[in-house]
Amino acid sequence: MMQRILKHGRLASAIVAGGLVAGLATVGRLKASDHQDTPEVELSPRYDVNDVYVFPAATPGRTVLVLGTSSPLTPAKTPSFTFGTKDQELYQIKVDNTGDAVEDLVFQITFTGAAGHQRVTLHGPVKPNTTGPTNTLVGGKKTVSGPVNTVLGSSDGVQLFAGPRDDPFFIDLEQFFRIVPDRKPVTGPLSQLPSTPTATSFRAAGQALDYVRGFNDMAIVIELPTSLLVANPQHPGRFGVWGTTSRARGI
């Protein structure tokens, strides 16, 4: 049994099925950002959800879901960085397609194997056994399974990729920690910044640095027919998406 939510990721809520990313604000976005929100994920960054993205695929009628995790500062030349294995960690993307802020569908992603030889398995989209902070493995037939760093596909049009990818987020992170030093990490070069505020605003355009450029996050990317996400494919409406990681009981 997998239990105990360690971190809820970004909520990309009230998304119009098949709509444009630029149009999300017109349907009422719920904004959230809570990196490093507990000492546990600060010391075990693999459990930290970086970002969740949802956008239309290049092919009409399809949607892309992205869950970024494993610390936002994974050096690009760190091929041995791994996902948590099935006996340790459960990665999930959850979908609410009825508007009650409770998951109606889940994608459960698990990993096996050691660094350089990991395999990924996806179950979903499927109705969850439980909802809320307690999570159990759905079991049943695998949707897709195979090695990481490979685009995998299923007969019903679900595609999966899991592996390191250039972090798509843009932020002058060094300056941010000069403004809010109590949020700086406890390890790495940014941990050496002063512990008291030394700035009150971000640097001006042209001076700001995209600090995460050249760093990876560990990405789980799913592309599938939008009809598999909505309650009624004939009237798709809106659906909300969020990501979580859970740790097995006793770990």
Annotate the PLM regions.
Residues 3-5, 23-33:
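Generic start-of-chain signal for non-secretory N-termini
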Residues 13-23:
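Bacterial N-terminal signal peptides
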Residues 2-15:
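Bacterial N-terminal signal peptides that target proteins for export
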Residues 28-251:
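Surface-exposed extracytoplasmic segments
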Residues 1-2, 218:
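Detector for methionine-enriched segments
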